[in-house]
Amino acid sequence: MQDKFIKKRHILEYEDKQLINVKLGITTREDGLSPYPHNAFNMARYIDDSQQNITKHQEMLATVIGFPREQWVFPIQTHENKVVKVTSNDKGTNIDALNDALHGVDALYTYEPNLLLTMCYADCVPIYFYSEKNHFIGLAHAGWRGTVGQIVNALISNIDFDLNDLNVVIGPATSTSYEINDDIKSKFETLPIDINQYIDTRGTDRHGIDLKRANALLLENAGVPKDNIYITNYATSEDLSLFFSYRVEKGNTGRMLAFIGQ
C-alpha cells in the first residue's frame, strides 16, 4: 500500500480523502541553499546557517503549501511536554527571528483558521492532530523525552470534543535502529502501555525502540480509536538523501519543518 505521505518538491505532503480544509506535511532536505553538506533545505534558524537561507526556504515553502509566512507559528522546542493553545495573535511568532515567545513549548493546537503550526525535526517524531468537524489542528514534537513525558496525552487533555472525531498522523522519524540504554529504558517502563510492543533488547545495556509505535500506543490508551491513527513508513535515519538525521549525522545536520494548517 502506498504511503500517504506523497513526495513533492521540497515536501512530503500527507494526502487523505478526509482532508478538505487541512494541509499537513514535512519538508525534505532536497533542493535548498544550506550546507549539511550542500544544497540542503534546512528550516532551523537556531543552527549554524545563514539567516537569509532560512528566510528564502520559508518563502519557497510558503509558495508550495499556500500559507504565507505571516500565518506561521513556531515555538522554541526543548524536548519537554508543555502544550500551548495558539490564536491569531501568535501569527508570525519566531518566523523572521527567534525570541523568547513560546519558549519551552513542544506541542501547539488551535481552533482558529488561517494558522500554520510548525516545528523542526531531525529524528524526533512529528505527530499531527486534526478534526475537520471541530476545526481543530495540533502538532507535537516527541523525542524519547517527550514520549516518556506523554506529550500526546498532554495535548489530548485540552481537547473538548469526542475523540472519535480526532485523527492523528505520525510522521517521518527515526527507525527502530534507534537504541537506548538501561537507564532510559527504565523511564519507559513507567508508561501505561506494553513495553514489549515497542522495545526489544539487543544486548547488554542496548535496547531498540520504536518511538512511532510507542506514541501510537499512548494515543490508543488515551482513547483515540486505532483506526484514526496513521503511521508513516518513512524513517529519517534510513534515507539521508531525503531527510536530516541528527543521530546518524552526529548532530552536524539541518532540520526539517513539520507543518499543519487550516
Swiss-Prot record:
Its cofactor is Cu(2+); Zn(2+). InterPro entries: Cu_polyphenol_OxRdtase (IPR003730), Cu_polyphenol_OxRdtase_sf (IPR038371), Cytotoxic_necrot_fac-like_cat (IPR011324). Its EC number is 2.4.2.1, 3.5.4.4, 2.4.2.28. Gene3D superfamilies: CNF1/YfiH-like putative cysteine hydrolases (3.60.140.10). One of its GO terms (molecular function) is S-methyl-5-thioadenosine phosphorylase activity. It catalyses: adenosine + phosphate = alpha-D-ribose 1-phosphate + adenine; S-methyl-5'-thioadenosine + phosphate = 5-(methylsulfanyl)-alpha-D-ribose 1-phosphate + adenine; inosine + phosphate = alpha-D-ribose 1-phosphate + hypoxanthine; adenosine + H2O + H(+) = inosine + NH4(+). Zn(2+) binds at H79, C124, H141. It comes from the Bacteria. Keywords: Copper, Hydrolase, Metal-binding, Oxidoreductase, Transferase, Zinc. CDD domains: YfiH. PANTHER family: PURINE NUCLEOSIDE PHOSPHORYLASE LACC1, UNCHARACTERIZED PROTEIN YFIH. Belongs to the purine nucleoside phosphorylase YfiH/LACC1 family. Purine nucleoside enzyme that catalyzes the phosphorolysis of adenosine and inosine nucleosides, yielding D-ribose 1-phosphate and the respective free bases, adenine and hypoxanthine. Also catalyzes the phosphorolysis of S-methyl-5'-thioadenosine into adenine and S-methyl-5-thio-alpha-D-ribose 1-phosphate. Also has adenosine deaminase activity. Homodimer. This is Purine nucleoside phosphorylase SSP1584.
